[in-house]
């Protein structure tokens, strides 16, 4: 058998100054993906990827840390301004937006793109605590 050589793909530093920050905030986690204007991912992070486990993933602090990590990674590629798309009902929505701004990214627009059903699937039953 032929031996496979260890060829790892090197990260190419792209020079992209404007992009879109997609914040997906669910009841269990917050995922921040920063893309270029065409939708190609440049950097991403999530509360779970940063080591938060269980109920700590759904906190605003975890969302803040995820947004900071994604912002720092995108700024290495030359990102300066972002448009923010927020999706979902989670606790980390506002915290993630504030963290992107605090990290040094200029926010040009904030859009709520939460999908709303026109009476689609039956929702989960109400919790009784």
From Swiss-Prot:
GO terms, molecular function: rRNA binding; structural constituent of ribosome
Cellular component aspect of the GO annotation: ribonucleoprotein complex; ribosome
Keywords, alphabetical: Ribonucleoprotein, Ribosomal protein, RNA-binding, rRNA-binding
One GO biological process term: translation
PROSITE patterns, sorted: RIBOSOMAL_S11
InterPro entries: Ribosomal_uS11, Ribosomal_uS11_bac-type, Ribosomal_uS11_CS, Ribosomal_uS11_sf
Top-rank taxon: Bacteria
Keyword Ribosomal protein attached: yes
Subunit structure: Part of the 30S ribosomal subunit. Interacts with proteins S7 and S18. Binds to IF-3.
HAMAP family, alphabetized: Ribosomal_uS11
Function: Located on the platform of the 30S subunit, it bridges several disparate RNA helices of the 16S rRNA. Forms part of the Shine-Dalgarno cleft in the 70S ribosome.
Identification of the protein by name: Small ribosomal subunit protein uS11
Organism this protein belongs to: Geobacillus thermodenitrificans (strain NG80-2)
Gene behind the chain: rpsK
């Amino acid at each position: 058998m032929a031996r496979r050589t260890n060829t790892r793909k090197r990260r190419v530093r792209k020079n992209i100054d404007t992009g879109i920050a997609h914040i997906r905030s669910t009841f269990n986690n917050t995922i921040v993906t920063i893309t270029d204007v065409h939708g190609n991912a440049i950097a991403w992070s999530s509360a779970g990827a940063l080591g938060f486990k269980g109920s700590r993933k759904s906190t605003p602090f975890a969302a803040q840390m995820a947004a900071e990590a994604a912002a720092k990674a995108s700024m290495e590629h030359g990102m300066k301004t972002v448009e923010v798309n927020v999706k979902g009902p989670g606790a980390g929505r506002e915290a993630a937006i504030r963290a992107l701004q605090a990290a040094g990214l200029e926010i040009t627009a904030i859009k709520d793109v939460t999908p709303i059903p026109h009476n689609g699937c039956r929702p989960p039953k109400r919790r009784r605590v």
